[in-house]
Amino acid sequence: MQYSFTEKKRIRKSFAKRPIVHQVPFLLATQLESFSTFLQAEVPTAQRKPEGLQAAFTSVFPIVSHNGFARLEFVSYMLSPPAFNIKECQQRGLTYCSALRAKVRLVLLDKESPSKPVVKEVKEQEVYMGEIPLMTPTGSFVINGTERVIVSQLHRSPGVFFEHDKGKTHSSGKLLFSARIIPYRGSWLDFEFDPKDVLYFRVDRRRKMPVTILLKAIGLTPEQILANFFVFDNFTLMPEGAQMEFVPERLRGEVARFDITDRDGKVIVQKDKRINAKHIRDLENAKTKYISVPEDYLLGRVLAKNVVDGDTGEVIANANDEVTESVLDKLREAKIKDIQTLYTNDLDQGPYISSTLRIDETADKMAARIAIYRMMRPGEPPTEEAVEALFNRLFYSEEAYDLSKVGRMKFNRRVGRDEIVGPMTLQDDDILATIKILVELRNGKGEVDDIDHLGNRRVRCVGELAENQFRAGLVRVERAVKERLGQAESENLMPHDLINSKPISSAIREFFGSSQLSQFMDQTNPLSEITHKRRVSALGPGGLTRERAGFEVRDVHPTHYGRVCPIETPEGPNIGLINSLALYAHLNEYGFLETPYRKVTDGKVTDQIDYLSAIEEGRYVIAQANAAVAEDGTLTDELVSSREAGETLMVTPDRIQYMDVAPSQIVSVAASLIPFLEHDDANRALMGSNMQRQAVPCLRPEKPVVGTGIERTVAVDSGTTVQALRGGVVDYVDAGRIVIRVNDDEAVAGDVGVDIYNLIKYTRSNQNTNINQRPIAKVGDKVARGDVLADGASTDLGELALGQNMLVAFMPWNGYNFEDSILISEKVVADDRYTSIHIEELNVVARDTKLGPEEITRDISNLAEVQLGRLDESGIVYIGAEVEAGDVLVGKVTPKGETQLTPEEKLLRAIFGEKASDVKDTSLRVPSGMSGTVIDVQVFTREGIQRDKRAQQIIDDELKRYRLDLNDQLRIVEGDAFQRLARMLEGKVANGGPKKLAKGTKIERAYLEDLDHYHWFDIRLADEEAAAQLEAIKDSIEQKRHQFDLAFEEKRKKLTQGDELPPGVLKMVKVYLAVKRRLQPGDKMAGRHGNKGVVSKIVPIEDMPYMADGRPADVVLNPLGVPSRMNVGQVLEVHLGWAAKGLGWRIGEMLQRQARIEEVRAFLTKIYNESGRAEELESFSDDEILELAKNLREGVPFATPVFDGATEEEMSSMLDLAFPDDIAQNLGMTKSKNQVRLYDGRTGEAFERTVTVGYMHYLKLHHLVDDKMHARSTGPYSLVTQQPLGGKAQFGGQRFGEMEVWALEAYGASYVLQEMLTVKSDDVTGRTKVYENLVKGDHVIDAGMPESFNVLVKEIRSLGIDIDLDRN
């Protein structure tokens, strides 16, 4: 097994029993692949597939003018590189996007020859089509400077669906069947039965009409309609009665209404007897072809065809007419002998279409189409052209109707056709096939569809959603272009005159900026980022709404297995509507979720891996991942637990066709991070998955000692760590950058061969948490491609580290851990274990007002020098200043309106020339309840406005940093070049050179070292080839220098140009404050098993319960939090964590007494290779073993993968290894080593019973008491009611509601109640009165009229009731 540079530093011991057969795929693949398919930016123009932008363009173009003599054709499109990189866009509040240009061709035809079109003129031109936001490498978008995520949508797949109403519509409980044809875009077509068994259709949920109107509209006659849906009985009329053609299966089960005889007249079935199988056999044996029936047997039957008099051509009876005695008389008169009637029965051949045809009053195709037109466009007069146009547009026009590739595939599969491709519009036989299946369902044949089956729901990803928006914009453009195309020739227009890109830009901007599926990225920690991008929502445009979604849609479905996580979903109104993709899930070309399985042939598991969608999976028998497999892949159990078509069953190995790839296949990323998930109740696991996403990154991240082995994948895939793009040697490292000299075999020709990684330092995330990267690599380290070079927020040595490992004791402690409260040791706070840094961004804007421009300045009147002490000469706070609530960060003054001056004042002003207008102080101050350190300031200045000194300094610093990078690259490039040069020059014969080098002298190393490197180029070599090489190297260095100078100039230009600011804004300053949040009572904390609580008390370290060796517990939890909640995983985690730490202590003790390396190696081998997955420690050098041991001193990290974790025996053996009997005895551990004797820190006495103690990975959640604490004395009031606003954000008051009023009434506290309802709330005059009284030193309340009473009076008046106060 290959260990990466970081994995070698600290190996996680895995207890997995099963080998890794399939690596977890890249976790952001769905987002990145979908968007790259949409753009196809890397694909050459000629090879672009018809998907994404290409599909949108080709579906709308060519646009033809109304007269047909001009058309605009699409040739190709190209995307220009973005003007600013991602970081610049975030700083400047811009959108990271690329300009889209399309090459279009305007073709003008000659109007003189309308019969044969002749091209008169062709104009080709590139046209700007708006901006397309680009996806960052981590799958998000930067829109107006903030990172956003486009969530994938789970919607109903296009195609045809059959369902029934479950008997809810009609009081009798009868099942009413219906069918619905859903296109990707276009009109929906519904078919439905009513309680009387008549079949109707409706278009776009409008008024229903008999389905035969639709069938006539597509060109069928009543005869053809009946022929399509019924089989016929043939009768021959005789002078007495008639003869019926004998079809055996049509008679079975019927009651004979007359004696049925064979040809010889022998009675086979007597009258009033039910015809059974024996009777039919007898009739078949008697070779009966016809049965004689009495005439009344024909009465009431329905004619299948029109009956026409052969001589006169007169229609005697129409198809679908009932046979009556008068009809029979007419037939006999016209000497017509053969007639056909419809065969129907009550069991499986209902007369539904026939009875529908009977209520249909339309006569022919045109009448049917007019009826449909009237339903779609009521009130408009139906002309023939309009009727035809509307009907064709409904289902047959490619512009208005698109079934899509998926829809066609699903449709054909459902109606039982073999081919899965076909036209994208609806065909006549599609409508017929749908109605036939619906009638068969009503007849009791076949099954209805399950709409929650993942074969009937598909995922729309970013690319597809963006394509739909782009197409919508293009369609708007098309309308405008059509109008103008007519004038194209007369006005000599070019393509860019025809196309206005605004509709496209606005459609795209609206989608990325304000669509329900475009969400502000959850960036609390790397896991929340990755989960947000893997989320699948059933809400959004074209999806469900919370209110209408029933229980079935939200429920877990058997097809979710391996595709959608059954655990991770929000609590509350969105439960089950927002899901997360399972770990291995993957989208196929149609947008259906697939999951991988291992192929099994003849009871033997192969290495072949197939991805199956929910539809395909139903056809196979699939074994679970925990089935026992021998070395050669044979399934060893007699019966294997497996799934088939959604059912779980035990089958023999020979029936198995596939097998799961991994036990963690069914859960999502967040759920697969919970160790011992299999021992937790599902509801608690749900909370655990959701709360991990809210964990705040700690100051010093610490890897979980008990993990699941997927931590590294999550950390790396989330993009928070820095990965090496190419292998090489680390050349330089500091806190902010890493420079790598790339391996020769990975360097591309003409490339610099240097990779520089600038780390992200103390940057604000969307949730105000801190993003900071710390280098792991040291100078001289050899790294390979993909190795982790630097840790990000919440990662430790390339592994996800959301919390801290705490020594936990499960015991009650003086009621301080009642109801999930948490008791914490002061040591945890003192060591800054849970201290986190939060970064607040504060903005101030200087605008151009009517009274003149606002000014950012240090010169503010009425402010003491103390308050201005932290500002520089530009009026902006220094970096590093520690500020508290109310401190000035940026000084700003705003012009104030002129007050009316008296003539005397005017005179004085005129004489002494005093300032004409006043200014008021509108400086940016630190908001209440906030304090911190200024860590960054950014100044943005509008184009054409003088930059202040501070802004100039910021630009100079940025340029200095950039020059440093370029110099490093140049240093390494030149170093490599001079090394090559030295090797080449050594031993060569010179014709002369600097320092009087004689002709014919051999060049020596000492001579070269004595010379300045640049003077080497002045050496004249005798060998011409070598001289040419010397020139080439000189040129390449010169070229690189020139390139770097150009890059520097480009950067300078970008920085010195004015910033794009909103209209009316002259200058904008952003100040970033770093706020340190220590753990304090009121903060919410949680483990990974849904065991959440609030810190109740921070106890001095000497009062905490401690062990025999004096080690105090960090956290004391209530044992009652475990049994009723059934999350036993936390107890197992604590035991295994205890073993992990114990092993670490033993390794630390070995290193301290400088044990021999063999002893350390042997101990490590014992830990890693006695059970679970073996590690190849023998491949490690002694130095590597030593470094590994040093990193394990704080605990040997364990991995217990979900559903494949550590067993009780393995945990016991690890505890035995960590705590040999002598150590266990000293610690006062029980015999089974699962509990410890604890002592009370306050009395020093031992507690009565032993206590479960161990290490748990505990998280601090983003629900901090600092953000929730809030107090107000006075503040803003609501405009209408004049009552204080509510909530911390509005600086509001506390609500005093109806029930609180009752409480004060019950106490009889009348004065308190009066002031609550008046002066403390909405009595405006009373409020000012109280203030006046207080100033006078008189503490009296004069309560007046509450404003809400006036509002009530006004509201009653608005109802037209004159109400007034009686003011006697």
UniProtKB/Swiss-Prot annotation:
This is DNA-directed RNA polymerase subunit beta. Signal peptide: none annotated. It comes from the Bacteria. The RNAP catalytic core consists of 2 alpha, 1 beta, 1 beta' and 1 omega subunit. When a sigma factor is associated with the core the holoenzyme is formed, which can initiate transcription. GO terms for biological process: DNA-templated transcription. Disulfide bonds: none annotated. Belongs to the RNA polymerase beta chain family. GO terms for cellular component: DNA-directed RNA polymerase complex.
